[in-house]
Design a protein with these regions (language model features):
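Conserved acetyl-CoA-binding loop of GNAT-fold acetyltransferases
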Residues: 134-144
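GNAT-family acyltransferases
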Residues: 1-91, 108, 112, 147, ...
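Short, Lys/Arg-enriched C-terminal cap helix and immediately downstream tail that follows
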Residues: 117, 145-146
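Conserved acetyl-CoA-binding loop-helix of GNAT-fold acetyltransferases
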Residues: 94-111, 127-135
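Alpha-helical hinge/cap motifs
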Residues: 85, 94-96, 142
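Short amphipathic helical patch at the helix-1/turn junction of helix-turn-helix
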Residues: 88, 123-124
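Conserved GNAT acetyl-CoA-binding A-motif
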Residues: 111-121
Length: 174
C-alpha cells in the first residue's frame, strides 16, 4: 500500500482523482474500505481491486465496482454495471499503460456473465484519460458541469460507457 500512497499523494496524480489531495493516513483508510467491500460483497455492491506492476514495481492501481442495473420500480434483475477506476504513477504517463490497464479491466469485467455495461467517470480536463477510453471505443454519454467539489473547487466530469455487444464486436480493437 505504501507505493500506492506515494504516487496518489502527488499533485500531478491526485488532481485527476475524485478524492483530491488526501494525507497518507486518509488514503490508507480509503483503500481499507475498498478492501473491505472486496472481501465482504453485498447484493447491492461489490468491488474488485488490482495493483499495476511493471518490473516488480507498483506503478498504479485499478478496479471496478459492480452494481445492479436500475430497473423500473426497482424490480430484481441479474444485469450488472461495472464502474471502472484507475490511477497511474505520473512517471509512466504517455507510455500506453493506461490503455493496457483499461483493456484488462474491461476484459475482466465482461468475463463476469451478467455484466452488461462498463462505465467510467473522468474529469472533463483529463484529456489523456478520455483519449484512453475513446481509443477502446467507449462512448462519451454525458458532460456534467460543476458535478463535484475537489479541494474546494467545482469540477466538470464526463461519463463514458461501453456495452458488452460493442466490446465483443468483430471490429473492436480489444
Amino acid at each position: 500500500m505504501d507505493a500506492v500512497v506515494t504516487y496518489r499523494t502527488r499533485p500531478n496524480v491526485y488532481r485527476w482523482l475524485s478524492h483530491g489531495g488526501l494525507a497518507s493516513a486518509q488514503l490508507r483508510e480509503k483503500f481499507q474500505r475498498r478492501v473491505d467491500r472486496m472481501t465482504k460483497p453485498s447484493d447491492e455492491r461489490s468491488e474488485v481491486q488490482f495493483v499495476v506492476e511493471r518490473e516488480g514495481h507498483v506503478i498504479g492501481d485499478c478496479g471496478f465496482a459492480i452494481t445492479r442495473a436500475w430497473t423500473k420500480d426497482d424490480a430484481p434483475t441479474p444485469h450488472l454495471v461495472a464502474r471502472i477506476h484507475y490511477a497511474l504513477d505520473d512517471a509512466v504517463a504517455g507510455q500506453g499503460i493506461g490503455t493496457e490497464v483499461v483493456r484488462a479491466l474491461v476484459d475482466h469485467a465482461f468475463s463476469l456473465p451478467d455484466v452488461h455495461r462498463v462505465q467510467a467517470d473522468v474529469f472533463a480536463g483529463n484529456v489523456a484519460s478520455g483519449r484512453v477510453l475513446e481509443k477502446l471505443r467507449f462512448r462519451r454519454e454525458g458532460y456534467f458541469v460543476d458535478d463535484g467539489v475537489i479541494d474546494g473547487a467545482f469540477v466538470d466530469a464526463c461519463l463514458y460507457s461501453l456495452l458488452r455487444r460493442e466490446w465483443e464486436a468483430p471490429d473492436h480493437p480489444a
